[in-house]
C-alpha cells in the first residue's frame, strides 16, 4: 500500500500538473495525478485531450520533474467509461487492457477499475481486468495497487452494494482504495451536497 497519500486531482492541463508539482514539493505532500482516459490515453487509442498527451508522453513529462511525491494514477478505467463511440463489451474490455498495459509500463501506480457499466457482469469483468493487470505488472517488474468501485456523486453509498464491493476487493492483496460516497457534492465552487459523518463511520467499519 502507498502510505500517506494526501489528495487526488485530475491533471486537466499542463498548468495544473506544474502547479501540483510545485505544491507537493513545497508542502511535502503526496499528490495522486488521477487521469481519466479522456484526459490521458494510450497512443494506440488516440491519446488524450490534455496537451494531446499519450500515456507515455504524460509519464515522461511528470518524470522530468523528478518529484517522487507525484503519483501517476488511472481514474475510472472500465468498459464504456471513455467518451466517443461505444463498442461492444468484448471490444471495450480489449481497449481497457490496451490502456492499462500502457499505464503499467509507464509507471502508473494506482489503477482505478470501474466496471459499473457492465451490469450483473461487473465483478467478472473487474476480475478479468485486475488479473490481467497483475500478470502484466509481474511480467514487467512493476508494482501496482488497485482502487475499485463507483457510485453517483452526491448519493449516499448503498451499504449492501458496498459490502459486496469490499468483499470482492479483499481478494486482491495489492488493494489501495475502495470507492464510497459521503453525500458531499461540489459543483463549480459550491458544495451542494450534504456530508454524512454517521454514514462514513459505518462504511469505515465495513
List PLM regions with ranges.
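Alpha/beta catalytic barrel-like cores
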Residues: 1-92, 98-100, 107-109
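Active-site capping/gating regions of soluble enzymes
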Residues: 3-13, 109, 122-142, 152-206
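Active-site-proximal loop/turn and secondary-structure-junction residues that shape catalytic pockets
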Residues: 13-15, 37-39, 76-80, 115-119, ...
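A glycine-rich phosphate/pyrophosphate-binding beta-strand-loop-alpha-helix module
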Residues: 104-116, 120
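Generic enzyme active-site microenvironment
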Residues: 73, 112, 147-150, 179
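Membrane-interface helix-loop-helix junctions at boundaries between adjacent transmembrane segments
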Residues: 93-94, 117-127
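Hydrophobic residues within beta-strands of alpha/beta enzymes
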Residues: 31-33, 111-116, 178
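Short amphipathic alpha-helices and their capping/turn segments at secondary-structure boundaries
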Residues: 17-24, 54-66, 95-104, 126-139, ...
Amino acid at each position: 500500500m502507498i502510505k500517506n497519500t494526501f489528495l487526488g486531482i485530475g491533471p486537466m492541463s499542463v498548468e495544473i500538473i506544474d502547479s501540483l508539482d510545485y505544491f507537493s514539493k513545497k508542502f511535502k505532500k503526496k499528490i495522486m495525478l488521477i487521469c481519466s482516459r479522456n484526459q490521458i490515453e494510450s497512443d494506440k487509442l488516440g491519446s488524450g485531450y490534455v496537451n494531446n498527451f499519450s500515456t507515455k508522453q504524460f509519464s515522461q513529462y511528470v518524470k522530468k520533474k523528478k518529484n517522487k511525491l507525484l503519483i501517476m494514477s488511472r481514474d475510472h478505467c472500465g468498459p464504456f467509461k471513455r467518451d466517443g463511440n461505444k463498442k461492444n463489451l468484448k471490444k471495450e474490455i480489449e481497449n481497457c487492457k490496451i490502456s492499462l498495459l500502457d499505464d503499467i509500463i509507464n509507471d502508473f501506480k494506482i489503477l482505478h477499475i470501474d466496471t459499473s457499466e457492465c451490469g450483473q457482469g461487473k465483478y467478472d469483468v473487474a476480475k478479468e481486468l485486475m488479473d490481467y493487470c497483475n500478470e502484466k505488472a509481474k511480467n514487467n517488474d512493476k508494482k501496482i495497487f488497485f482502487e475499485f468501485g463507483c457510485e453517483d456523486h452526491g448519493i449516499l453509498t448503498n451499504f449492501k452494494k458496498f459490502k459486496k464491493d469490499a468483499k470482492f476487493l479483499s481478494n486482491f492483496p495489492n488493494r489501495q482504495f475502495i470507492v464510497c460516497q459521503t453525500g458531499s457534492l461540489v459543483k463549480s465552487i459550491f458544495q451542494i451536497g450534504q456530508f454524512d459523518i454517521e454514514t462514513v463511520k459505518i462504511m469505515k467499519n465495513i
